[in-house]
């Protein structure tokens, strides 16, 4: 028969209390690790993201739902349930991931309401359009893969990497790098502009495009056989290049005030 002294009984009770609390918290964290919303129609799908300081991965797939996962998000403590921190977005966190998601027509808008830095992964239908807005200067990383529709980016200092996209891509940024690897070039114009930072574009070797490239204090480099600029224009390694690629095609405009522009063949 085991006998416990009063101090040991207190320690034993405390141990079980901690264990129960840990189990409860773990279950709570697992309960809301994923959020889903279905797009009502197969065409005209759009995802609008308003993010603040977090890193975001957008992955396209063959499906009709938006699936969101948050890595590193800590749920609101029980004592704070129903309360909202001052200075936080007035939108309500209805995903339990620090995000507010609303469906209007065939557009899902996701707004980050929590100021905490989290890594979010969003799976979105492959033919959905993406509109991404960075709302603060906290800076994160943005990665987009396999989307076959318009990508619109309004960035402050996030580094953005787009892989296996068709666009068109319309991006404006203050600082940070923008890297795009095109699977093909859409017929609509693509335009990327920066104040400070590099623009790195990869195209299939046979891509037809009409280029307009300009940098104020950087260089333009390429491994494509671009025709030399007309007399009086800057040389290829200089500040401005305009002309056809492989005979011409959709307009591809790349502008940066302070940074380099790279136009390379997809390997």
Descriptions of predicted regions:
Residues 159, 163, 168, 177, ...:
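Tandem repeat domain/solenoid detector
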Residues 13-24:
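Bacterial N-terminal signal peptides
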Residues 27-50, 55-137, 143-148, 152-154, ...:
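Acidic (Asp/Glu) and glycine-rich low-complexity loops/linkers
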Residues 161-163, 169-173, 181-193, 207:
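Short helix-loop boundary/capping segments
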Residues 73, 140-142, 158, 176, ...:
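Hydrophobic lipid-interacting interfaces of membrane-associated proteins
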Residues 1-15:
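Positively charged n-region of N-terminal signal peptides that target proteins for export
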Residues 130-133, 141-142, 178-180, 200-202, ...:
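Beta-strand-rich extracellular passenger or scaffold domains
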């Amino acid at each position: 028969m085991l006998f416990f002294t009063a101090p040991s009984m207190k320690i034993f009770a405390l141990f079980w209390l901690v264990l129960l609390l840990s189990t409860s918290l773990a279950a709570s964290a697992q309960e809301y690790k994923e959020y889903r919303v279905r797009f009502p129609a197969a065409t005209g799908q759009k995802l609008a993201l308003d993010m603040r300081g977090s890193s975001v991965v957008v992955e396209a797939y063959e499906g009709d739902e938006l699936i969101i996962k948050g890595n590193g998000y800590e749920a609101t403590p029980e004592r704070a349930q129903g309360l909202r921190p001052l200075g936080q977005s007035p939108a309500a966190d209805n995903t339990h991931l620090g995000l507010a998601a609303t469906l209007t027509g065939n557009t899902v808008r996701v707004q980050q309401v929590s100021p905490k830095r989290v890594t979010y992964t969003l799976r979105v239908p492959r033919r959905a359009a993406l509109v991404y807005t960075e709302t603060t200067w906290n800076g994160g990383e943005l990665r987009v893969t396999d989307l076959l529709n318009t990508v619109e980016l309004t960035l402050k200092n996030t580094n953005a990497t787009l892989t296996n996209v068709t666009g068109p891509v319309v991006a404006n940024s203050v600082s940070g790098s923008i890297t795009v690897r095109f699977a093909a070039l859409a017929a609509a114009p693509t335009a990327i502009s920066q104040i400070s930072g590099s623009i790195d574009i990869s195209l299939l070797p046979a891509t037809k495009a009409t280029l307009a490239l300009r940098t104020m204090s950087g260089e333009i480099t390429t491994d494509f056989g671009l025709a030399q600029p007309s007399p009086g224009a800057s040389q290829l390694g200089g500040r401005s290049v305009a002309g056809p690629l492989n005979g011409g095609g959709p307009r591809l405009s790349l502008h940066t005030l302070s940074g380099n522009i790279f136009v390379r063949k997809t390997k």
